[in-house]
Structure formats: structure tokens, C-alpha cells
Amino acid sequence: MLRAGAPTAGSFRTEEVHTGTTIMAVEFDGGVVVGSDSRVSAGTAVVNRVFDKLSPLHQRIFCALSGSAADAQAIADMAAYQLELHGLELEEPPLVLAAANVVKNISYKYREDLLAHLIVAGWDQREGGQVYGTMGGMLIRQPFTIGGSGSSYIYGYVDAAYKPGMTPEECRRFTTNAITLAMNRDGSSGGVIYLVTITAAGVDHRVILGDELPRFYDE
């Protein structure tokens, strides 16, 4: 790929497609909120402006994708397949912790081959809402977590703005504000915001369009 001058036809063909991104998940009493931006890039080209990076692993378990788009989706697909079999064997929905362990094991096994970071979040009858980070094959439960290239811009904001005991609507607002701030500063994040709220009652999907995003001082 040329480093100077105007890009030529086909100059992006050898660039790996990345969900250079901002992903986030937050626990609340009775469920979780998972959110992401929607931009996918290959080199300096934006190849998809509205890609949904929130992938279902089971009925009430989702993962948020970042890293190489193909690698992240491959991990999600493998995990979803294993969890489907696991649920059939148990004759009940798998636990969120089990889903996180599946993702962790796949990520660690193929750590030399796959470039991806997945956040696993969901609800089950045993522990309620849960959020797990799985970067590099680790597994840690957190009240909230962020990931992707845009996350480096918002650590200070999320640390200051998070408070225990938030309502679902407060969690959605917290997630929307954080991802919007990251999108304003990270060239690899952008587009719309996808939000998924998972509770015992089911899964609620929302899309925050560009003209509906909150506005901040720098704009």
C-alpha cells in the first residue's frame, strides 16, 4: 500500500479488516447493558459504517467484538456453537460464566493466530447480570469494562462517571456518553451506537443514530 499520495484502486485490498472500535458493558441489578460503535476499517478506508459488533452467543448472552473483524467473529461463532451444544446437553441455558470460559479458552488456544478481544456479558438465573473481560485468554468479572482502540480515550471518564446501583436507563446513558466521547477522538471508531439490554425478561435492542448522539463541548 502506498504511504504517500492519493490511494489507488485496489490499494486497500491487502489491508486486514479491523473493528478498530469502542466496546463497553455495564452491570446493573438484574441485568447488563452492552454497547459498541459501528465503524469497520481496512487501513485508512472505512469499509462498513453500520456493522453490529454485538454478537449473540446464546439467548441472554452477548459478546462485544474488537480487533480483526474476521478473527473476532470466528471466536464468537465457535463459542456460540459450543454453547448451543452445551445447552442441549444440560437441557437448560448455559451460565454466563460458562460462556465467558468458552471464549477465554478459544482466545488463549489461538492467541498466536487470532487478533481479537471480546467482552462477554449476559444474564442467568444463578448470578443475574454479569460482565467478563477475556483479553489474551484471561477471565475477570467486573462491574463494567471497556475495550477497543477508542477505550484509551475514555478511561478517565468511565472511572469518574460510574457509580454502583445505576438503573438500566442510567447504564444506557453512561454507555452512550462514553462511546460517543471515544468516537469523537478515535479515528477508528464512529457511525452509530448499538445498545443491548439483557434481563430476565429478555433482550432489548436499540440503535442510537448519529443525529441522536449526545453533544459535548469539543463539538
Swiss-Prot record:
Residues 1-20 form a propeptide. It holds the Pfam family Proteasome. It comes from the Eukaryota. GO terms for cellular component: cytosol; nucleoplasm; proteasome core complex, beta-subunit complex; spermatoproteasome complex. It is found in: Cytoplasm; Nucleus. Keywords: Acetylation, Cytoplasm, Hydrolase, Immunity, Nucleus, Protease, Proteasome, Threonine protease, Zymogen. Its EC number is 3.4.25.1. The modification N6-acetyllysine is found at K53, K109. Disulfide bonds: none annotated. The 26S proteasome consists of a 20S proteasome core and two 19S regulatory subunits. The 20S proteasome core is composed of 28 subunits that are arranged in four stacked rings, resulting in a barrel-shaped structure. The two end rings are each formed by seven alpha subunits, and the two central rings are each formed by seven beta subunits. The catalytic chamber with the active sites is on the inside of the barrel. Component of the immunoproteasome, where it displaces the equivalent housekeeping subunit PSMB6. PANTHER family: METALLOPROTEASE TLDD (PTHR32194), PROTEASOME SUBUNIT BETA (PTHR32194:SF12). The proteasome is a multicatalytic proteinase complex which is characterized by its ability to cleave peptides with Arg, Phe, Tyr, Leu, and Glu adjacent to the leaving group at neutral or slightly basic pH. The proteasome has an ATP-dependent proteolytic activity. This subunit is involved in antigen processing to generate class I binding peptides. Belongs to the peptidase T1B family. This is Proteasome subunit beta type-9. The gene is Psmb9.
